[in-house]
C-alpha cells in the first residue's frame, strides 16, 4: 500500500482535493480526518453534530481546530442544497422531503460533492453500502456512456498490485455490462499509475469450453476492445481466460498461444458478482493480499464505501484513492 500511496501523493501534491467524511461522530473517521488534515494532500470536510464531534475529539485527544466541521441540520448551506436537490430530483422529491433527506449526513455530503463544494465522499464506517451508494446514484449519477457503477478492489501484497472487479455491486451482468466494467477498470488502473493489462475471466480459455456463459464473456471482450479503441484508451483488453492462463506465462503459452496477454494481466474482470466477491476474498484470506475497496467507478464524481469493520488506516487509504479519482 505504501507504493500506491506514494504514487497518489505525487498526483495530489498541490491540488487541495476536498473529501467529505460524513461520519464525523465515528472515532475511526475522526481520527483519520486529523491524519489527512496533517498531510496537505487531502483536505477533509467532516459532517456531524458539533457538540458530539468536539466531545469525541476531546476524548481521543485530537486537535480538530483546523478541520472544516459541518452540521447538516444547522448549516447555512442547507437551503441552497435543498433547492439544488429538488431541481436534480425534479418531479420525484418535494422541498419538504428534501429538507428531511438532507438531515441525513450521506445525502448532505453527496450534495456537497454535486454542488462542487467538495470533490468526493467516503462513507460506510457506520452505514450500509445502500446508505452510501443510493444518494450517489440518485444525485451524482453515472458518467455519459456508462450505464452502471461497479466496485473494484486493489489487491496488494509487497510490490504486487492487481485490480479485481466487479466484486461489490452488480449481481447480474450481460456482455455490455462486463465490457463497461473492463473499460472503466482499465481507466482506474491508468489513474493509479498502472499499465492496464485487462483479462476477462471465465472457466474457458480462448474457446476451450462452450456454453452461454462463455459466449457472454467472448462477446464482452469484443465490445470492450471496440470501446477502448474508440476512446483511444492505452490498455490491453483480452479474453476469455481461465485465471491461471491470465496470470502464469507458462500456462498462457500452452493454453493461449498468440493471445495479446501472455500471463501478465494485472486487471481481472470476473464474469459475475459471485465469482468476483469470492475471488477477492480467497486472495485476501488465503493469499495474504490486502484488499483496498470497494472503489466505485463509473460515477460523475467519486463516492466510495467503507466496510463497517474498517480501520482508521482503511478510512485514510480510501480517502487518498477517492481524491485521486477526483482528478480523473
Curated annotation (Swiss-Prot):
Localization of this protein: Cytoplasm
EC number in record: 2.3.1.8
Primary location class: cytoplasm
Reaction catalysed by this enzyme: acetyl-CoA + phosphate = acetyl phosphate + CoA
Record InterPro entries: P_Ac_Bu_trans, P_AcTrfase, P_AcTrfase_dom1, P_AcTrfase_dom2, Phos_Acetyltrans/Butyryltrans, PTA_PTB
UniProt GO molecular function: phosphate acetyltransferase activity
Keyword Nucleotide-binding appears in the UniProt entry: no
Gene Ontology CC: one annotated term: cytoplasm
Domain of life from the UniProt record: Bacteria
Keywords, alphabetical: Acyltransferase, Cytoplasm, Transferase
Keyword Phosphoprotein among UniProt keywords: no
Entries under Pfam families matching the protein: PTA_PTB
GO biological process: acetyl-CoA biosynthetic process
Group of enzyme by EC: transferase
Pathway as given in its UniProt record: Metabolic intermediate biosynthesis; acetyl-CoA biosynthesis; acetyl-CoA from acetate: step 2/2
Assigned protein family: Belongs to the phosphate acetyltransferase and butyryltransferase family.
Protein name stated in the entry: Phosphate acetyltransferase
Amino acid at each position: 500500500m505504501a507504493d500506491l500511496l506514494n504514487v497518489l501523493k505525487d498526483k495530489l501534491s498541490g491540488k487541495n482535493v476536498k473529501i467529505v467524511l460524513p461520519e464525523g461522530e465515528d472515532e475511526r473517521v475522526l481520527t483519520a480526518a486529523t491524519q489527512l488534515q496533517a498531510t496537505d494532500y487531502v483536505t477533509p470536510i467532516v459532517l456531524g453534530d458539533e457538540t458530539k464531534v468536539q466531545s469525541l475529539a476531546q476524548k481521543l485527544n485530537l486537535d480538530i481546530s483546523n478541520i472544516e466541521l459541518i452540521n447538516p441540520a444547522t448549516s447555512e448551506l442547507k437551503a441552497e442544497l435543498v433547492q439544488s436537490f429538488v431541481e436534480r430530483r425534479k418531479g420525484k422529491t418535494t422541498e419538504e422531503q428534501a429538507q428531511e433527506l438532507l438531515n441525513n449526513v450521506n445525502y448532505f455530503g453527496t450534495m456537497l460533492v454535486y454542488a462542487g463544494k467538495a470533490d468526493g465522499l467516503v462513507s460506510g464506517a457506520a452505514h450500509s453500502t445502500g446508505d452510501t451508494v443510493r444518494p450517489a446514484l440518485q444525485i451524482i449519477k453515472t458518467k455519459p456512456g456508462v450505464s452502471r457503477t461497479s466496485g473494484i478492489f486493489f489487491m496488494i501484497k509487497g510490490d504486487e498490485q492487481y485490480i479485481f472487479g466487479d466484486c461489490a455491486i452488480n449481481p447480474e451482468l450481460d456482455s455490455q455490462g462486463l465490457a463497461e466494467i473492463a473499460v472503466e477498470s482499465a481507466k482506474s488502473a491508468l489513474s493509479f499509475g498502472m499499465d492496464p493489462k485487462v483479462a476477462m475471466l471465465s472457466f474457458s480459455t480462448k474457446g476451450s469450453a462452450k456454453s452461454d456463459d462463455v459466449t457472454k464473456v467472448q462477446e464482452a471482450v469484443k465490445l470492450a476492445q471496440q470501446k477502448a479503441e474508440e476512446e483511444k484508451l492505452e490498455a490491453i483488453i483480452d479474453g476469455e481466460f481461465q485465471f491461471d492462463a491470465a496470470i502464469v506465462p507458462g500456462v498462457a503459452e500452452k493454453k493461449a498461444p498468440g493471445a495479446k496477454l501472455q500471463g501478465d494481466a494485472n486487471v481481472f474482470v470476473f464474469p459475475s458478482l459471485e465469482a468476483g466477491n469470492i475471488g477477492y476474498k480467497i486472495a485476501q484470506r488465503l493469499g495474504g493480499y490486502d484488499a483496498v475497496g470497494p472503489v466505485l467507478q463509473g460515477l460523475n464524481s467519486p463516492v466510495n464505501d467503507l466496510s463497517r469493520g474498517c480501520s482508521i488506516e482503511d478510512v485514510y487509504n480510501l480517502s487518498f484513492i477517492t481524491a485521486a479519482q477526483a482528478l480523473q
